[in-house]
Amino acid sequence: MSKSFAYRHIWCFWRFNTPLLWFPQPLKYWPAFQQSHTFNSMSVFKNDNAIANQTTVNESDVKRNVEKINDIYECSNNTKSPCFPNSDSRIPLVNWKTSTNPTLQVRAYMLDLLLPFFTLDLLPFLNKVCECCNHMLLDNPKIKQDLPFAFCYLFSSYFSYKSSRQYTCSSEEISKVFRHLNRLGGSEYVLHLFAQIPKALCKELTDVRTLNHPLRSIFTFCFKNISNPPNLLKLLTKLYPRSDRANEVLYTQYLGFLTKRGDYQIAIYMFDEMYRTHHWSSFTACRLMIESLVRQNKFEEAISLYKKIIAKRPKIARDKKILNLLLYISTVSNRSPDAFKLALQSISNANQIPSFDVFSRLMSALVKYNMTEMILPLVKQYDHKFRNLYSPNIFLSIVQALVFCGDMVNIQRWYNMSRVNSELSRIKHLLNCFLNSSTVSLDVSMVLELLRDLKKKKIKVDERTLVICITIFSRRKDLFAMEKIHQYFSDQGIKTSNQAYAALLDAYIEAEDTEKIELYLGKIRRLGITEDVSINRMLMRLALDRLDWDLLEQCTKVAERKDPEGQDYLSTITMLYHVRQHELNLALRIFSGIQKPNVVHYSIAATVLGNLNQLDQLLLLEKRMESEGKAPTALSLVAFVSSYCKQGAEGLDEAKRYMSKNFQPDKRALLFNPRTANDMTYPPSLFSSLIKEYTSLGDIKEAKQVLSTYLEYFSKNITSKPDIPFAIASMRLYCSLHDTVLSRQFWDLILQVAQQNFITTDIAAVVDDKNIPSPSGVIPAYKSALNVAAETYFSFLASVNSFQELDQEWSRLEKLGFEYDDSLQNKRIIWLLYDDRLDAAIKRVYNIFLSSKRIEELIPDASSQNSIISFFLSPDSPLYFSTLKALRDKLDMAVEDDFVRISQGILVPTVKYLQTIRRDNEILFNLLAKV
């Protein structure tokens, strides 16, 4: 059989048994070489088993400019014209071979040469094609610009032939074809070839549901090397209208390419063309567009686009990734209730939670929007759908949500469940949650549970965990527990980081422990970390605490060099420095020099203006803050309301207006939650100044109205825990009304908060494995914390002659470990005298003020009794002259009555009683004699 006969036989078989090997639609014409091409055909395929991948073509030399390709060549029967069929008319293969167009010659030559190998599988056939290209380039390097078109046409024909015979191949095999085409410099032809691949050949390639397409990296390379991809994509939709699915894949991939690169304007244009012109709205494309808008912080536009899309394709509302985006919008933006409502509606319509991620994000959103009542029902719904598939992350999200709500009962319950049902491998992350919620961190019981489990399960901790623990205990001012946990982690080999040293220094500054401050300052200097950002900020705070201007100037220089992001903090410290120095006008001057003041700066300025009684300036400051778009926080609300309350009746009206404007129900959850205000005392403190002012003015009706507003808020918002200032203000209100029952309720509330927050932590039982708990007591920093509250309540009890209850409550506080200051001790003596208990009053004077130990503390160098008496009669005496005068008056009355009632109601003659005082406590006797 001759060679020509074999070719004719193959041609006839091919022509009548397969689809025609032409492009179904015309391609654009590429300029041909002016000179003719010659090939040495005998050099081709000397080795039929040649390996592919031998083409070495520089891609930058063969880039094409799509904008130069403007017209599709019209069909012509003139074989000398390098045009392609635009109808069913076809140009025979022999005419291509005899064409004067070099591009057609290369294509005809390759097709003529490789037709016999169409029966091979894809990879062997690709090897033949690559070998052919290599030999052709060796024979004539000038044809490299014609090879991509020929390569594309050849594989288009091959794919059509194979598809008609139910041949399938994998995406990995097809990707090798496209990579070779890219190496030849045919990025545009990659997209042409993809648009022509029969769907049956590899269904995976036309899946628009995922952005992670098998050819994604290849498409990215093409989009980078094509000068105008949008024009080419439009052209493909015209050339291959039947390849609608493939074209949608290309559009979606280009959309992903644009959004990843940040070309949002082009992305919007392309999506609009997909959505309006071609009516494509795949889940992936919609998600890409919403994501791109979210990255630009265009939350309202993203929500608007979502609404338009689901109006056309309601099923998109159930897509878990788009749902997650909506919940993300609702949690990160200042206020996006629309996004949250849409997400909730979609979840409600589907009657199920679609994924773990959506559930976790949903927990955060519920906390933010103060819908804590929905948390547990949704947890039950999740439980029903996933059948107890509680992963560590899910348990973490549930406990986090409850932590942000301050719901201690359910926190403990779900944490215990996590121990049984799941290995809570991310247990240490909960410590960070507790740090963000002072409701939980001040209670500290759950912190101890976590530390116990960290030790029991031998979970590895890091420097960040140490910093969190130090911060939690320093916030409670429990220095013993803080030092104990620091030592415990250090013994485990955890290094004390710069942030940890800063946290320790912060704690000792707060506790005013001069000795420990100097100790850690020495360590910091020896380590050479004084210019660390976190350390420098604590040194600023130390300078503020000591009113050390030189140290503050040194810190300022360091901050200007190394802490550009800390300029706001520096301005805050400088303003507070001037405020403490009573240089209020200088503080305002610093504020006016800040280019973009934050809410803290506004709060300090409001406090200063309130102290200066400048109501007009305070109103202007409020307007400026609104005009700059600064949303009020809990701190700014307290600052403005308190400052307004100091301006008399007119200021009180402004305070009421300001609070009613900013304390709307839909704003409360944004203002008062553990994320926006670490100190949960802000919500009640907001009401404290108002209740106090209305009560002092005698406007009981308004005071009750403010109190009822808070109680309504408190009953619906478990994130807010009453603090002591609020309870004192409320108790003072009911004391003024002589309401014993409600006054007692608020007093009990004060003690409840105190027992929760002011009692020492039994840290030794955790780190030392002690089964016997250590005796608890009041944290030293809080020993005198209840003096103001006690004075208010005890004065009320004395005014209504409830001396028995006063004695009980006084003893109750002493048993808890709280201490009374000298002022309260003097009042206690007066109350005893009111109750006609002279003997008890005299004994208290001796035990509290005139014991040898107290005299030694007060007058270390006392040389005689006269000097002691002189001190106690001076203005510096802790025993007030008014107290001594009341004692002397009571004794004079006893002299007139001729007897004194002592313990157990026994009556003693006054003369004998005075002799006893002179014998047992001569100093007191002589002191009273001189009054």
From Swiss-Prot:
Transit peptide (first-last residue): 1-16
Cell compartments where the protein resides: Mitochondrion
Extent of the PPR repeats: 247-277, 282-316, 429-461, 462-496, 497-531, 598-632, 683-713
GO BP annotations, alphabetical order: mitochondrial gene expression; mitochondrial translation; mitochondrial translational initiation; positive regulation of mitochondrial translational initiation
GO cellular component terms, semicolon-separated: cytoplasm; extrinsic component of matrix side of mitochondrial inner membrane; mitochondrion
Alphabetically ordered keywords of this record: Activator, Mitochondrion, Protein biosynthesis, Repeat, RNA-binding, Transit peptide, Translation regulation
Domain of life: Eukaryota
Gene null: resulting phenotype: Impairs growth on galactose. Decreases the association of cox1, but not cob1, mRNA with the mitochondrial small ribosomal subunit.
Assembly and oligomerization: Component of the MRH5C complex, composed of mrh5, ppr4, mtf2, and sls1. Proteins mtf2 and sls1 form a subcomplex that serves as a scaffold to bring mrh5 and ppr4 together. The MRH5C complex associates with the small subunit of the mitochondrial ribosome.
Family matches, as PANTHER family: PENTATRICOPEPTIDE REPEAT-CONTAINING PROTEIN 4, MITOCHONDRIAL-RELATED (PTHR47938:SF35), RESPIRATORY COMPLEX I CHAPERONE (CIA84), PUTATIVE (AFU_ORTHOLOGUE AFUA_2G06020)-RELATED (PTHR47938)
Protein name as annotated: Mitochondrial cox1 translation regulator ppr4
